[in-house]
Amino acid sequence: MAGCIPEEKTYRRFLELFLGEFRGPCGGGEPEPEPESEPEPEPEAELVAAEAAEASGEEPGEDAATVEATEEGEQDQDPEPEDEAVEEETATEGEEEEEEEAAAPGHSAVPPPPQPQLPPLPPLPRPLSERITREEVEGESLDLCLQQLYKYNCPSFLAAALARATSDEVLQSDLSAHCIPKETDGTEGTVEIETVKLARSVFSKLHEICCSWVKDFPLRRRPQIYYETSIHAIKNMRRKMEDKHVCIPDFNMLFNLEDQEEQAYFAVFDGHGGVDAAIYASVHLHVNLVRQEMFPHDPAEALCRAFRVTDERFVQKAARESLRCGTTGVVTFIRGNMLHVAWVGDSQVMLVRKGQAVELMKPHKPDREDEKQRIEALGGCVVWFGAWRVNGSLSVSRAIGDAEHKPYICGDADSASTVLDGTEDYLILACDGFYDTVNPDEAVKVVSDHLKENNGDSSMVAHKLVASARDAGSSDNITVIVVFLRDMNKAVNVSEESEWTENSFQGGQEDGGDDKETHGECKRPWPQHQCSAPADLGYEGRVDSFTDRTSLSPGPQINVLEDPDYLDLTQIEASKPHSTQFLPPVEMIGPGAPKKDLNELIMEERSVKSSLPERSGAGEPRVSFNLGSTGQQICRMENLSPVSSGLENEQFKSRGKTASRLYHLRHHYSKRQRGFRFNPKFYSFLSAREPSHKIGISLSSLTRSGKRNKMLRSSLPWRENSWEGYSGNVKIRKRNDIPCPDFPWSYKI
C-alpha cells in the first residue's frame, strides 16, 4: 500500500521503545534460563587466572611450587635442587599447554572485554498451564503476545496486528520439538505441547517481527468504529481473584478478517472452585468462535457452539490434570449494527438506551422454573441451602467446566440478538458480584451522575460502579466492563441544557450546586483511543466508602440545602413534614402524644415554673415548639412555657397511669446491630436560655433506627441546669466531619 496512516509514526516510535525494553527470551527476561549456560563460568575463570599469571611474568604452577617449598623450610634457597625445580616447571608448563589446547575450541585465546551490565528486565508472562494440545496453540500464542504488549501500553490496533503475525509464524513452524508424547495402556494418547518451550518460541518470533516492522512497517487501515471502554476489577473480600475479562475492540485485526464488518468482542468470566476454567475460557472462547463454520453468517449460533466446544475441551483438560472448577460467562459480540449476546450462568450484561435499562438476558439460576424442570428431568434436584443450589452444591445451573456435576450443570449457552439503531448509550457487563447487589436502574443512575459530575469523562465509570456494589454489601469478586456505544459527552451536554431550562424557574438546582459557574470551561476532550482503567486485583485508591457512596446509601438521602452556609431554625413551618435536611430544635419522639396528656404536662410545668425563683430573661418572648414525630400529626403551641426536661425525675414517676401514657416521650435507644452504642447523659428535650453563638456547642438531632425514633443531645455548656429557655434567630453551620451512620445530619452553632 502506498498510503500512510497518521498513526504510523506513533507505532514506529512505540516499536523502538519496546525493543529497547524487550530483548526477547534470550535478553534476560526468560522465565527459566537454559541449563547448558550454568557450567560455563568455571573454565572462563580458570582461563582468566592463567592470563593474569602470564601477564605478571610468572607461570601458573609457581604458586603451588612456592607453597610446597615453604612447607619444607629453607630447601628452596639451596643451589643443588635447581635441576629438579626446572623439571617441575617444565612439567607444569606442559600440563598448562594441554589445558589451553583442550579449552581452545570453546574459548578464544584472548578473552573478550567485559560488557556493561544491562538493567534487569521485567519477567515475561508465564503460561499458567504446563501442557496444552495442538488446538490450543493459537489461543495460547495470542494471549502471551497480548499480555506482553499491553504491559507496555501498546495501542490496541498495533497489539492485535503483532499478535496475529506472531501467532501465524508460530503455527507455521515445526512444533514437534515442543511435543510430549504420552502413552496410556500401551496405546498412544493425546499429544501435548510443553507451554514453557512454546512461550520461548512465541517471544522470539515477537521480537523478530518487531525488529522487522521498525524498518518496514506494514501499512494497514485503522478501524472506523472504536468503542470507548471503562474496566475495573477487584478481589474484594475473597481470598483469591477468580474473575477474568476480555476486551478485543480490534477483532478483525486480531484474526485477519478483511471481508467482515467492523467487529468487537467483550466478555466476563466468573470462576468458582479455582481460576483455571475462567482463564481457559478467556483465552480460547473467542478463538473457537472464529473457527465455527456458521460464524460468517450466524454469529449468535456460532457463539453457542463456541461455548459448547470450550466446555468440552476444558472437561477433557480437567480430566487429564485433575481439575475441579468451573466458570460462568457472558459474551457480547458487535458486528456492524448488530449486538449478539451469549451466556452461561449468572454473569450478566445490560443495555442502556436513552437513559433506560433494557433487559437482554435472563441468568441461569436454579430457581428459574425451566432450569429446575431440566435438572429434575435429568435426575438431579434443586434444594435451598442458603441459596437455591443444584444438588445442594452450586448456585448456578449452567457453567463451563464442573465435570463432576455434569449433566445437571451443562455448558449449553443461550443467545440473543439486538439491532443497534444509534440511540443506545452503553453496555454494562459484570459478574454476579455486581448484579446481586445493584439493580439495573441503580446502575444507570450511578453512571449518569458520574458523567454529569465529570463533564462526560467516562474513564472512571467502572470504578464508580464497583464502589457502589461494594458499598451495597457485595463481598464477592467484582468485575465491571462499560462499553460506550456513542459519544456520551454530547449526550451529557444536551441533557444538562434541558435540565437547566426546566429548573431555571424553580429556584435552585438539585445537583449539589455544581452548576456551570463552578465547573467553568474544564471539559475534557473525548479520548481518541481506548481508555481502560487498570483491572487490578485489589481495591486501589479507596480511603473510605463514603467518598464513593451513591444512591445506594443505607440511610436517608441528604438533600442539599438552598443556602449551603447556614440554616435558620425559626423559619420552619410545622404544617410541612420534615425531611432529612434538618429538624427543629425541639422534636418529640414516638407515635405522637395525646393532647390531653400534653396539656396536663404543660399545666403542671407552669405550676412548677411559678414556684421556681425568677431568672434573668424569663419575661422575654418565647418561640413556638413543635411536638410530635416527623411526618405525622404535629401539635403546635404558641407562647407557652418551655417543656420540662425532668421527665425522669420524681415528678414524672408520681404521675402514675399518666406517666405510662407518656412513656413514649422518654428516651429509649435499642442496641444497634453494628458499631457502638450511645449512652447519652441527659434524657431531655432541647431547652436553653441565652443561647451562645460560639462554635462547638452542639444541638440535638432526631434519628431513626428500624421502627423507633430517638433524640440524642449533649450537654449545653452555657447553662447546664436550665429549666426554661427560649430560641432566637439561631443560625447553625454544617459540620465537616463524617457523622455517625445513624445520624444523617450534624450541625454546629
Curated annotation (Swiss-Prot):
Q: Give me the ranges of the annotated region Disordered.
A: 21-128, 495-537, 608-627
Describe its assembly.
Answer: Heterotrimer. Interacts with PAX1 and ARHGEF6 (or ARHGEF7).
Please give the InterPro entries that the UniProt record associates with this protein: PP2C, PP2C_BS, PPM-type-like_dom_sf, PPM-type_phosphatase-like_dom
Q: What does this protein do?
A: Protein phosphatase that inactivates multifunctional CaM kinases such as CAMK4 and CAMK2. Dephosphorylates and inactivates PAK. May play a role in the inhibition of actin fiber stress breakdown and in morphological changes driven by TNK2/CDC42. Dephosphorylates PRKAA2.
EC assignment: the record states 3.1.3.16
The record's annotation in PANTHER family points to:
PROTEIN PHOSPHATASE 1E, PROTEIN PHOSPHATASE 2C
Give the note describing cofactor binding and stoichiometry: Binds 2 magnesium or manganese ions per subunit.
Residues recorded as binding Mn(2+) 2, renumbered to this chain, are 270, 432, 476
BP GO terms, sorted: cellular response to lipopolysaccharide; cellular response to xenobiotic stimulus; positive regulation of stress fiber assembly; protein dephosphorylation
The record lists the lineage as: Eukaryota, Metazoa, Chordata, Craniata, Vertebrata
Q: Where is the composition biased (Acidic residues)?
A: 31-45, 69-102
Keyword field = Cytoplasm, Hydrolase, Magnesium, Manganese, Metal-binding, Nucleus, Phosphoprotein, Protein phosphatase, Repeat
> Compositional bias of type Pro residues: which residue ranges?
110-126
Q: Where is this region: 7 X 2 AA tandem repeats of P-E?
A: 31-44
Q: What name does the UniProt record give this protein?
A: Protein phosphatase 1E
The UniProt record lists the PPM-type phosphatase domain at 224-485
Question: Cellular location of this protein?
Answer: Nucleus; Cytoplasm
Q: Give residue spans, biased composition: Basic and acidic residues.
A: 515-524
Question: Which organism encodes this protein?
Answer: Mus musculus
Q: Which SUPFAM superfamilies match?
A: PP2C-like
PROSITE patterns (alphabetical): PPM_1, PPM_2
A GO cellular component annotated for this chain's UniProt record is: protein-containing complex
Q: Which residues carry this modification: Phosphoserine?
A: 532, 545
Cite a single GO MF annotation. Answer: protein serine/threonine phosphatase activity
Q: Which reaction does it catalyse?
A: O-phospho-L-seryl-[protein] + H2O = L-seryl-[protein] + phosphate; O-phospho-L-threonyl-[protein] + H2O = L-threonyl-[protein] + phosphate
